[in-house]
């Protein structure tokens, strides 16, 4: 934050992010989240939340149980103590979010790619075996639907711009 301030880069969203992060009761999640965001290239919003991705079915249902609607505007939550906080449990209980590259690997045919808005306080774990590409949380808001990837950074294989669906 100090370096950004010296360079004249606005820091308000980072300050808001840190405020939200400090509300997270998990030291491990606090320690791991920024590294996840940095390596995934995921943005921090003005209110200090962050955006991540999730592949869902064509009718906006989750791909695992096909019982949770992930339509834009939905707030999805579960009790925090039912989310696996063990980062060594790579596929386990919880609400999943991911970097674009990882999430796009789950999309098939007419599946949809959604943008999730997540408060840092709700992050429970960042699994250890996916190079900081996915995580688990206890709550997220479905923020938008991705209609297309505008550009992909060929070296880092991540989108540098996405087009969100209108409506």
Q: Which role does the model predict for each range below?
A:
Residues 2-90:
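ADP-ribose/NAD+-binding catalytic cleft of ART/PARP-like enzymes
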Residues 79-152:
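ADP-ribosyltransferase catalytic core
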Residues 1, 141-154, 159-166:
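Acidic, proline/serine/threonine- and glycine-rich low-complexity intrinsically disordered segments
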Residues 69-71, 132-136, 158-160:
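Generic alpha-helical propensity signal that fires on short helical segments
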